Amino acid sequence: GKAGVVNVHLGDSPRCMDLIERVVEETEIPASQILPTHVNRNEKLFCKAIEYALKGGNVDFTGNEDIDYWETVCDEVRVCSGIRRMMQAGVDPKHITISSDGQGSLPLYNEKGEFLGMGVGQSSCLLKEVKECVQKADIPLEIAISTITSNPARILELKGKGRIQEGYDADLCILSSELELMEVIAKG
């Protein structure tokens, strides 16, 4: 089984995370049960996500295959710089994850914000984002890789996942020293 965590997809509403904050502040539901995703959608939302994570909440960045496009055309906070900024603000990196919306619908826009059509999210963006964290933002590899391995496994309470440890599933990606994918082993 897995934990009863509610994954909340955030949009461009000016209310940002107001309703999530109210649930955590006004009910018995702990922040650990709500995982807001797409927290890097825009600067205002990202700043609210820092506040939420500083209070112990978990936050999820959306990784992208075309990193430059989403930062420049869509005004998203680049994942590597966002994680670096969160850490500089004092957020425990154990509260940060990156997900891909892998195989989900992905709206595409031009420089004017006009809708161009639909694409497909790629899970391959996860490794690309980890590489950027390490190579462009100087985030230690063990922290960067934990955002797609041990952190989500712990937050979602996925037994036997997210670590290289006796008794765990041997799900491994073998990487080169340049962080290029060389081999995948599932349930080794």
Question: Can you describe what each PLM-predicted range is?
Answer:
Residues 1-109, 115-116:
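Active-site core of metal-dependent hydrolases
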Residues 65, 147, 180:
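Residue-level "edge-of-site" marker
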Residues 88-168, 172-174:
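His/Asp/Glu-enriched, well-ordered alpha-helical/loop segment
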Residues 176-184:
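A cross-kingdom feature marking charged/low-complexity
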Residues 187-188:
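Glycine-centered positions in the ABC transporter ATPase nucleotide-binding domain
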